[in-house]
């Protein structure tokens, strides 16, 4: 893959001797993942009805790999019922690792389109409060759609500058997730136009 020169130089400086291994990953097959919505169905019950073979993502209890070259889970009724979220396994990690407990007050600072927020809401199990924020009001609409589809309750949708949230909610939240908007490198294999746009 031909990467932008500025990007290559930045990554060489950042990664040093690991740069070659990093760039080699762009030539490897892409991994497709889905995360079971445990707010609606247990992992065990989903595996009983899963319409295709799934392989567990080793570090995510409700994450699975699927063969994205031959199946389209975004067209299955289970997708439209909110039983799973299509998400790269690496993107599942932040919400999985945040130690959310039922009853917590949780803020997802950069929440759209909802992959992390839906997992945080499932962990809350209808208790506590989830504040899902995204600076972009148009992206917040998609966030709302996904939270509704996933059956996540006790949620507040915000579209505010992150710096202002502290004045609205001083010392309120038990847990805060900031998976700041990315620069797009993860999309390089999915959409070649992202390489040019970087």
Predicted regions and their residues:
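S-adenosylmethionine
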Residues: 1-198
